[in-house]
Amino acid sequence: MEDFNMESDSFEDFWKGEDLSNYSYSSTLPPFLLDAAPCEPESLEINKYFVVIIYALVFLLSLLGNSLVMLVILYSRVGRSVTDVYLLNLALADLLFALTLPIWAASKVNGWIFGTFLCKVVSLLKEVNFYSGILLLACISVDRYLAIVHATRTLTQKRYLVKFICLSIWGLSLLLALPVLLFRRTVYSSNVSPACYEDMGNNTANWRMLLRILPQSFGFIVPLLIMLFCYGFTLRTLFKAHMGQKHRAMRVIFAVVLIFLLCWLPYNLVLLADTLMRTQVIQETCERRNHIDRALDATEILGILHSCLNPLIYAFIGQKFRHGLLKILAIHGLISKDSLPKDSRPSFVGSSSGHTSTTL
């Protein structure tokens, strides 16, 4: 997720005393630093054209899936639930990130040719998506916990509170992504492709370690603990209760946690190993460095895939989304109204009984 910025005439002073062989938040060492690195990389990147194809597929799937999610939620004004609002914001975050994927894909082949302004903008969108997406997932788990375990929506049903929570998530995400906006720019150097990267002056090493800790804590560990706590108690309640749709609810909840872990756990484990190596807790060798660099490239792709899987997890699994989409198609005369399910309702998140929602 990081790129590199520096003036070519400040190379030695800028990197004095820092290990040049390894820093990357989600990618390997920029090409123009390879000659200065103490370790000669065996293979620093996955085949770039393969990565471009993956980015293109994720872009198309995310664009289509998240657009449909937003369309169905916006059409469902009457029965829109709290979780619908969170899903709307989640789809928006993933959609904004998807719009940057063509630029990132092009940079994999040609280097960064888009200038400093786009360097800052697309990097900011990528960081904001990273933070806001996972924080919204945590909010959804809290909403499910309150609805099923405590059978209440007294707090979360207040519209002004839900809007405040969503605005707070966007604000916090922008705050956490602010260093990217401040420090990223484009660097041009002889004999290598231009790149988009951070430039933090003489304190680059210390700042980067701080920025490494932030995404691991706020972007993964804290939301994961919240999700495990909320969904753990939710599953226990569903096992004890006699709810008609509890098996469907359990499948959806398991899918939520499983996909989240599959997409983000490998990357964060590799990132943790990389952090321990930088702080000398784990001895660094060239072989270990090369393995971690390749692992960061591979596991980053899993994280990117999560943005196009969200519509499948939170919408397509639920029949209410399909009903809502069919209603939109019927309204515009694309299908017959006779094909609509009789129990089709505006909200696609799940079925409710009283104050308790039993599916995601």
UniProtKB/Swiss-Prot annotation:
GO terms for cellular component: cell surface; external side of plasma membrane; mast cell granule; membrane; microtubule cytoskeleton; mitotic spindle; nucleoplasm; plasma membrane. The record marks D35, A36 as: (Microbial infection) Cleavage. The modification Phosphoserine is found at S347, S351, S352, S353. GO terms for biological process: calcium-mediated signaling; cell surface receptor signaling pathway; cellular defense response; chemotaxis; dendritic cell chemotaxis; immune response; inflammatory response; interleukin-8-mediated signaling pathway. InterPro entries: CCR1-9-like, Chemokine_CXCR2, Chemokine_CXCR_1/2, GPCR_Rhodpsn, GPCR_Rhodpsn_7TM. Phosphorylated upon ligand binding; which is required for desensitization. Pfam families: 7tm_1. Keywords: Cell membrane, Chemotaxis, Disulfide bond, G-protein coupled receptor, Glycoprotein, Membrane, Phosphoprotein, Receptor, Transducer, Transmembrane, Transmembrane helix. Residues 1-48, 106-120, 184-208, 274-294 are extracellular. The keyword Glycoprotein applies. It is a multi-pass membrane protein. GO terms for molecular function: C-C chemokine binding; C-C chemokine receptor activity; C-X-C chemokine receptor activity; G protein-coupled receptor activity; interleukin-8 binding; interleukin-8 receptor activity. Belongs to the G-protein coupled receptor 1 family. Receptor for interleukin-8 which is a powerful neutrophil chemotactic factor. Binding of IL-8 to the receptor causes activation of neutrophils. This response is mediated via a G-protein that activates a phosphatidylinositol-calcium second messenger system. Binds to IL-8 with high affinity. Also binds with high affinity to CXCL3, GRO/MGSA and NAP-2. This is C-X-C chemokine receptor type 2. It comes from Homo sapiens. The gene is CXCR2.
